Amino acid sequence: MEAFSSKDMAMQAQKKILSRMASKSVAQMFIDDNSSEVLDELYRVSKEHSGNRAEAQKVVKNMIKIAVKVGVLFRHEKFSAEELSIAQEFRKKLHHGAMTAISFQEVEFTFDKSVMINLLSDCRDLLLKLVEKHLTPKSLDRIRHVFNHYSNPELLTHLYDPQGNLWSNLSKICSGLNRMIEEGKL
């Protein structure tokens, strides 16, 4: 006989509903203005680099879905002590990645795409390890899609070109990341 849990059912419903509603208006309920601005700039970077509006929207939508689902899992205290340790490691790696991204933008001639690719890959792997027991294979593919998209060497080279057309977007992204770090959100 299966054990019934209304709490588990409510969490599943929340994850399902929120994943279907990952639009900009719903994102604003869960994501502050600063984060929203960073997401908007990441969308513009993806759209400009790929020339594909639909793909850029899909990447950002996947990012929002992932953030919401991980937030729901935290809210419902679904992570074990071991997983919470992985979450801490992920948070530290993400913070380190943000600091590195900012440093590469602020200090000329320091950009090293292999460093950024490795940081993004490490973040992806930690996040996958954190949620692998909680999310569907489709959600895990969304995580891979987002991190693989932004760790594309051509995109990173294009983004970090001071003479390139994405430099102003990078400046805004780094500005937003700086604010998140100052506010203790990243």
From Swiss-Prot:
GO terms for biological process: innate immune response; regulation of apoptotic process. Transmembrane segments: none annotated. Pfam families: DUF758 (PF05527). The central region was initially thought to constitute a DED (death effector) domain. However, 3D-structure data reveal a previously uncharacterized fold that is different from the predicted fold of a DED (death effector) domain. It consists of a large, hydrophobic central cavity that is poised for cofactor binding. Gene3D superfamilies: Tumor necrosis factor alpha-induced protein 8-like. Keywords: Immunity, Innate immunity. This is Tumor necrosis factor, alpha-induced protein 8-like protein 2 A. It comes from Danio rerio. GO terms for cellular component: cytoplasm. Acts as a negative regulator of innate and adaptive immunity by maintaining immune homeostasis. Negative regulator of Toll-like receptor and T-cell receptor function. Prevents hyperresponsiveness of the immune system and maintains immune homeostasis. Inhibits jun/ap1 and NF-kappa-B activation. Promotes Fas-induced apoptosis. The gene is tnfaip8l2a.
